[in-house]
Amino acid sequence: MDVERHHAIAPLLAEWAALHDADDRATPYGTAAWARAAVEHGCAGGEPWVLTVRDGGRLVGLMALARRQRASMRVLRPLGDEHADCWDVLALPGMREAVERRLAAELRHRSGEWDALVLTHLTRSATVAESLTRGGLHARSHDGLPHPHVALPETFDAYLARFPSERRRRMRKHLQPLDRGRVTARTVPPAEVADAVACLLDLRQRQWAHVGKALLPALAEERFRGFLTAVATELVPAGLASIVEYADEGAPVAVYLDFMDARAFHGFMGGFEPGAARLEPGKLHILASNRGSIEAGRAWANLGRGGEDYKQWFRPEPFVSRSVAVTSGRLRSRAALVAGTLAGRLR
């Protein structure tokens, strides 16, 4: 297997997309579309530093990183991880172990090009941290925010059966406005993506302001609006993202943007009119999305990083977002790990 390092991602995008489609553990956050939007809209996290693994010329693995200067250290992080919910190496099924072994060797070989590697929000099934350790790199893992996932059964009735009767009654009551037609859900077509993203961000800002909170600064920046619009413009037609607009008696009141594939639903972001809070649009959307994902045959509904109390209402599995800090073996890199810099201040 041959490994190359790339600073320009444009020549890789077509092969990247094909590899992502073939990877049975990939998520929408690992798409070529996500990477391209991150680079084009200043959300990459630094200069692209992408390792590709080829077997006989065929792309069989890809590690999408970005390198930036942090004080005196050159830090590698997942490309576009500022807004991604989870991350992993891309690899063809059956070749992941060999790909990760080869990537670990290449990172050691290129240790003069970086001082620290910080892999954040690893997927539940990620094995790259263990592969890097076996490859002779020094790593320190730590648990981050809760990352609740709901295991989806074969039917929605089976999902409801997990709950006490009073909770089942309340869940069905939450869905009644949608099921009886008072509230309607419209999937936004590709031609309306840009307007829908703008509406979502406006609603979210007003929703938070109504309760005396401010959005995270990064979410209020124009670059985030451009990034999210670019991602949705590519992934909505591909079936890897969906924007749903909810209307109450004909008046639009909420917009939600989520990502999905054949295996899992990834809740991402939404916003609603403060006056519609009585409908609890968030709970309504999660319940409707869980029901739709069950009908689509998905196995998991990812509720996003964070331990907010409302997520426990849906009885998720208690997964935790895991990160790993890796040193290049050089003196200042080892010293930073000992001091806890990589696992702490570099998050």
Model region roles, listed by residue range:
Residues 334-347:
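C-terminal secondary-structure termini that scaffold catalytic or DNA-interacting sites
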